[in-house]
Amino acid sequence: MTIAVIIPTFNRIELTQNCLASINLHDHIDQLIIVDNGSTDGSNKLATIALPTNQGFATACNIGAAHATTDRLIFLNNDTIVHPNWTSFTDLLEQPDIGIVGPKLIYPDCQIQSAGIAVDFTRPPGLEAWNLNTNWATTPTDVDAITGACLAITSNLFQQLGGFDTGYWNGYEDVDLSLASIQAGFRNLYDPTATVTHLESQSGPERWTSVTENVTRLRTKWSHK
């Protein structure tokens, strides 16, 4: 099985350089696709695909996926540092009932940042999806959603689900895709045996500009299903 790593970028070239350096140290990947969202700091020079303007996370990832020629896709934030054997979690995709998988995400101080995402629409708006941030699982475990900071899916299923919903702006696209995977009859797994350090939102404040709209879209689309 072949793997493409798709990295959307928007400025903060130093983050991308550090991410790429870690990828080069660990594990073989078959295709690296960097999609730049109209950066002004030279990040476009590192890009496989340089977009003229910032079209957001979902669009950049979908464009990257369209250029992939591999069996598996890993969507990876540029504010991450990968660890040895980090791509091993994608082997779970060989199971026919598995839709989306993700590794353990940790902060630079090694505290857990995400062990998968839980979704509960009975909680107040804005709290319906939250990171499970404790070492609660020691083997691959079912979760509602996987964070888009590092998320793997087969190319076929990504295409079947229609990719990331571009109606979101830099937030909740990952939860949406994960719920679509479950609706299609698949399971989503968190794999604590693979690790990625996530600096979390170091690439800029734009993630927080459309939280209300993103939450409304997620609830409207999924809370009654």
Question: Model-derived features: where do they sit?
Answer:
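Short, flexible, basic/aromatic active-site loop/helix in glycosyltransferases
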Residues: 120-144
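N-proximal low-complexity "stem/linker" segments adjacent to membrane-targeting elements
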Residues: 1-22
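Short, acidic, metal-binding catalytic loop of nucleotide-sugar glycosyltransferases
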Residues: 21-30
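A short, conserved alpha-helix in the catalytic core of glycosyltransferases
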Residues: 90, 142-162, 167-195
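Conserved donor NDP-sugar-binding/catalytic core segment of glycosyltransferases
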Residues: 80-119
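Short aromatic/hydrophobic "clamp" motif used to bind/position activated sugar donors
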Residues: 73
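Glycine-rich, basic loop-to-helix element that forms the pyrophosphate-binding segment
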Residues: 51-68
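A conserved acidic beta->alpha catalytic loop
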Residues: 13, 22, 36-44, 53, ...
